[in-house]
């Protein structure tokens, strides 16, 4: 055909554009091969993407460990935080699953990172995504080969943690775990031929861990002082198998079917001694054994139809999940006058079904996407307390509880892009009907629930200052619904004198977010900067309180009124030479919690008042990537977290350094690596909490230092 010039803006936001019909004049001649090449950006204004293989210092560990080196991400108490908040929605391959939690975050510290290809961070999600998670979304993408034929990867890593004692035990209790082993074999297989692609992934992560070694000093207004230690030796074995197939039924239709089965076995052996203020008298020794088995099974089926117009697609997906938690606790309560034996058994079965329909229509200057989603979630929980002689368990607080939620939703999202302007505007409307039915004989709580129909808009306006500079303005509204464990009515006794209890009267937390971001690129680097402000209504948090005549502390979830988070984030990347690249991430923010008053119902009604709290916090993360001759690569990461605000108190500063080295062997098919986390063993978690007539300071000397070695081979 004769050449024809038709100017248009390709942009970066849409893979396909509708340019209409372009009429060409025929002119038969041979054409040379046309090659389109390019490299995907890792840091974009709307999404940050990170390959797990580049995270050398955390290779062979868990997904949680792999994520703590990423810009804007911190970890605390086994959860991810984005910009200081743990209200994060975690997806696997774009979907919520019981493996990582539907409402909160679970098991991230036990899922092997060896099965993961990349991790995506979205701070301001569009209406296409579910509305929960005010801090943003983390999408974990499993590995899937795209080469034809049979190929795969095998790997084996091992390590040791708790190499030396951070702090000695109080006298008279069992030893801490030391020299804790970590073993992670992994296998990935893929066969692609013609219209069929088959895939299989299997991983096993076995670890022993000094999971908790917390020393708490409690001070009461009446002059009493209690010193305690909570030491938890944990043994975990987490196994997963994922398999499936992609079938190209025709040139326009693809069917994908996959399933995942996982088991997580946890054994916790704990000791909790309680002393007077001078440590001259042991008042009590609480020992426990937790035997827990978690079983997860998921099934996914998806149909994708490609219309004749390129990029116009219809996707229909069905996801079903079953997740069982089978917990057995055994307690020994050693008092000066007697020894008591207690136990309980908890069985929780989670059933979730999701159906979604998504449609994408390319436009000349962008695209339109819309869809519907329906979720049904049902969780019956049975708690059976078995009190012994002189029992301290609240046996009347057991029984059945049934959690049920129904969520239909629909959304529309419009994307426009020209040579200077980008617009993304969307609206998601969700209806939620949640009920929580409890045992009618429960001494404190009654059945509860809520329902609402709410809009969740999102807006992004961007101006391209130049080819290397873009300015973006964001707004979105999101919700964090209480998870089932947040409203669970059964007291938890893994800490005998700081008891955690849920609250069925909890209501959703709503967040409005405003952000102004800028990205400036140059030849060998870039600067990403943003200023953000979040306003939270009905903030969900735990409130610590006491009741008259008792030194026991009850941690109960409550809606604590309004809170605010205002901050600035910077990500600077610079390739300083052919062998070294440095990334510096700085995140500073101010947390404010307004004054509030709550009424705790458990174990008896009591009122708690808190004054306004205000604290400036943040974190600094320096990451160096080094490329040496003979296929040798290295990584060094240093992380500092400033003191941070929590309702009723604060957490203190923390610091750690991680490092790793890997070498390619066997003509690039093999790889050896060695790494170490928290090299200097400096990481401690220290908190201060103030209540109505008490305060306590806790410092956790849990295991953070681990050395690993491993080998991977591709075929």
Which residues does each predicted region cover?
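Outer-membrane beta-barrel translocator domains and adjoining extracellular loop/strand segments
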Residues: 165-170, 211-223, 268-280, 326-335, ...
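Periplasm-facing N-terminal accessory domains of Gram-negative outer-membrane beta-barrel systems
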Residues: 1-33, 74
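C-terminal extracellular loops and terminal segments
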Residues: 119, 560-564, 581-653
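Extracellular loop and loop/strand-boundary signature of outer-membrane beta-barrel proteins
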Residues: 171-175, 224-231, 282-289, 338-345, ...
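Face-selective signature of the C-terminal outer-membrane beta-barrel domain
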Residues: 240-264, 288-439, 464, 468, ...
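Membrane-proximal, glycine/serine-rich, low-complexity loop/turn segments characteristic
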Residues: 10-11, 15-16, 39-271, 290-322, ...
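Outer membrane beta-barrel strand-and-loop segments of large Gram-negative receptors
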Residues: 352-356, 397-399, 403-404, 503, ...
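Conserved "repeat-terminator" motif of extracellular CCP/Sushi domains
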Residues: 19-30, 38-40, 140-145, 596
């Amino acid at each position: 055909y004769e050449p024809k010039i038709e100017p248009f803006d390709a942009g970066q936001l849409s893979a396909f554009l509708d340019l209409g019909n372009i009429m060409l004049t025929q002119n038969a001649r041979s054409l040379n091969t046309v090659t389109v090449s390019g490299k995907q950006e890792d840091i974009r204004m709307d999404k940050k993407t990170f390959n797990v293989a580049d995270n050398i210092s955390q290779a062979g560990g868990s997904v949680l460990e792999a994520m703590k080196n990423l810009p804007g991400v911190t970890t605390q108490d086994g959860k991810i935080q984005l910009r200081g908040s743990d209200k994060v929605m975690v997806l696997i391959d774009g979907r919520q699953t019981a493996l990582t939690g539907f409402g909160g975050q679970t098991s991230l510290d036990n899922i092997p990172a060896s099965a993961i290809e990349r991790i995506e961070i979205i701070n301001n999600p569009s209406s296409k995504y579910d509305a929960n998670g005010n801090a943003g979304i983390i999408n974990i993408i499993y590995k899937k080969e795209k080469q034809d034929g049979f190929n795969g990867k095998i790997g084996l890593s091992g390590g040791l943690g708790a190499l030396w004692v951070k702090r000695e035990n109080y006298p008279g209790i069992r030893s801490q775990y030391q020299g804790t082993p970590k073993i992670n074999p992994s296998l990935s297989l893929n066969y692609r031929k013609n219209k069929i692609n088959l895939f299989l992934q299997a991983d096993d992560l076995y670890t022993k861990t000094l999971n908790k070694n917390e020393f708490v000093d409690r001070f009461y207004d009446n002059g009493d002082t209690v010193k305690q230690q909570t030491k938890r030796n944990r043994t975990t074995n987490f196994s997963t198998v994922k398999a499936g197939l992609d079938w190209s039924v025709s040139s326009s239709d693809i069917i994908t079917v996959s399933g995942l089965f996982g088991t997580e076995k946890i054994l916790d052996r704990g000791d909790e001694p309680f002393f007077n203020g001078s440590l001259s008298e042991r008042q009590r020794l609480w020992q426990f054994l937790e035997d827990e088995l978690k079983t997860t099974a998921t099934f996914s089926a998806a149909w994708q139809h490609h219309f004749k117009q390129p990029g116009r697609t219809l996707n229909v997906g069905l996801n079903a999940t079953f997740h069982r938690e089978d917990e057995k606790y055994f307690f020994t309560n050693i008092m000066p006058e007697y020894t008591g034996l207690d136990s309980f058994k908890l069985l929780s079965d989670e059933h979730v079904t999701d159906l979604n329909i998504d449609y994408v229509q390319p436009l000349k200057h962008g695209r339109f996407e819309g869809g519907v989603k329906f979720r049904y979630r049902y969780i019956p929980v049975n708690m059976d307390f078995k009190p012994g002689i002189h029992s301290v368990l609240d046996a009347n607080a057991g029984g059945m509880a049934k959690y049920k939620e129904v969520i239909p939703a629909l959304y529309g999202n419009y994307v426009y892009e020209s040579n200077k302007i980008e617009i993304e505007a969307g609206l998601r409307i969700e209806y939620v009907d949640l009920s929580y039915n409890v045992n009618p004989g429960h001494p404190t709580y009654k059945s509860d629930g809520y329902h609402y129909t709410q809009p969740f808009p999102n807006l992004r306006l961007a101006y391209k200052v130049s080819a290397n500079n873009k300015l973006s303005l964001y707004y979105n509204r999101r919700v964090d619904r209480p998870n089932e464990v947040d409203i669970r009515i059964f007291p938890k006794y893994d800490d005998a004198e700081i008891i955690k209890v849920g609250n069925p009267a909890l209501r959703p937390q709503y967040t409005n977010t405003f952000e102004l971001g800028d990205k400036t690129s140059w030849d060998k680097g870039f600067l990403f900067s943003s200023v953000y402000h979040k306003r939270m209504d009905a903030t969900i948090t735990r409130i610590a309180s006491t009741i008259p005549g008792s030194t026991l502390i009850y941690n109960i979830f409550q809606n604590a009124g309004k809170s605010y988070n205002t901050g600035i984030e910077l990500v600077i990347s610079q390739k300083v030479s052919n062998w070294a690249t440095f990334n510096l991430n700085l995140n500073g923010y101010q947390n404010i919690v307004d004054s509030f008053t709550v009424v705790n119902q458990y174990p008896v009604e009591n009122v708690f008042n808190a004054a306004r709290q205000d604290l400036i916090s943040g974190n600094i993360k320096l990451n160096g990537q080094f490329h040496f001759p003979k296929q040798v690569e290295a990584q060094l990461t240093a992380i500092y977290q400033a003191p941070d605000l929590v309702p009723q108190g604060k957490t203190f500063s923390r610091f750690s350094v991680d490092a790793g080295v890997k070498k390619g062997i066997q003509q690039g098919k093999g790889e050896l690596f060695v790494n170490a986390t928290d090299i200097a063993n400096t990481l401690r978690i220290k908190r201060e909490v103030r209540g109505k007539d008490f305060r306590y300071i806790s410092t956790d000397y849990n295991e953070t230092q681990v050395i690993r070695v491993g080998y991977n081979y591709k075929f």
